[in-house]
Amino acid sequence: MSDPAPRPLISESTAPESVGFFHPSRRPYRFTILMFISLLVLGSYFAYDSIGALAPTLIADLHLDRSTIGNLYTAYSVAAIVIVFFGGMLYDKLGPRRASLLFCLLVLVGATIVAAAHSRWELFAGRLIFGAGSESLIVVQSAIISRWFKGKEMALAFGIALTISRVGTLFSFNTEELIARYFGSYRVALWAAAAFCLFSVLCNLVYNAMDLHGEKVLALPKPDGGDKIVFSDIKKFNSSYWYVVLLCVTFYSAIFPFTALATDMFHDKWGIPLVSESTGGLLSQALVNFQHMFSTAPGMTSIIIFASMVFAPFAGDLIDRIGKRATLMVVGSLVLIPAHLIMGITHWNPVPSMIVLGAAFVLVPAAMWPSVPLVVEEKRVGTACGLMTAIQNLGLGLFPLLNGKLRDATGTYTATQIMFACLGVAGLVFAFLLLRSDRRHGGKLEQGKSRETELARVEEAEERR
């Protein structure tokens, strides 16, 4: 039995007057479903950093060493490396609704196991399951956004989704220790993380209903599994791509493995309190905690994420207009070095260094990820992004473990901060090599929209001659 012919897609400009305000072809419907698509990963972002946010309490109450905290992040990345090879294929096989629900449930199961765990192995098992679901869910979320916003407000939609997702991380760092102290148990805080994951599952059900309705009314594009690795494409990548990949590994390895134990470092080295002292109910204390974000250890850690939430969409728009992607990656890698060294070898207030890291975390990803389609052929972008994500997770798996082991071995965070500064040096080298390679390949990364448009017009004129 053949499928019925797809109905023509109704755009806002061609929609008949009889179509209602909340019709799937209308902007209000798209942005409402975008809200629920964005909330699919809110729980996973919250739960991912709940371990780092609670690190001092977990170390004290469970008698864990720092390397165990790092290992919990490593377990997540191991699952992420494996699942990146299958996530896109599962999406193609199951479709957007069933795939997103499956991965949301995996995230919930993993977070629940972590919250209920009574041994280290149960903690590791929970993080493995959580990582498998979370990384796949991020891939699926990107594919779903592309499905609904292709040819429309794509860049805006991705910016909104990232900002809403990062709210989970911001809340995790600024509420988890408070929840643990308020209820007298770290386990309640871990259950709060699982509750956020349950909330994402409920949002998934709303998304499923809206997507099903939209699919019945509109001829939505055929689901695309997103970033899938085709091994035959790998040998076709030029040097610029590989420098972007190496820069990606070194840069992210100097950020996320650092934040895994940054809360413990600020509390351990500077004696910065874990929560802001206040009275009243939990909500009242949480508001005070957010107001004094720069004066608590978890709040300082979240400065990087807060900067990304607020400024990343503007940075993306700016870079689209001016170009200079390789140059900005040089600058972003450069500032990592003094920021980490100052926190490692001095007792200066760490807030300025964290603000610098936040600025780097705004600039470099905004320049890095859009560079991939500029240095590889369009048909190989999926392989390029999938491979880059897999290699990135190698660093995100290795360096949290090294961070914890160095702290356990030396008794201070000086060696770990020097390690992160060295990653900044390596990233700076790769950024300069990328800049040189890009110049040899036409300087596409340095071009802004106006220059790209001008070159496109020249090429079109030459083709007509």
Predicted regions and their residues:
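Conserved MFS/SLC helix-loop-helix module at the cytosolic interface between two early adjacent transmembrane helices
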Residues: 82-121
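C-terminal transmembrane helical hairpin of 12-TM major facilitator-type secondary transporters
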Residues: 325-371
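Helix-to-loop junctions at the C-terminal end of transmembrane segments
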Residues: 83-95, 311-324
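Helix-breaking motifs and short loop linkers at transmembrane-helix boundaries and internal kinks
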Residues: 63, 95, 116-122, 133, ...
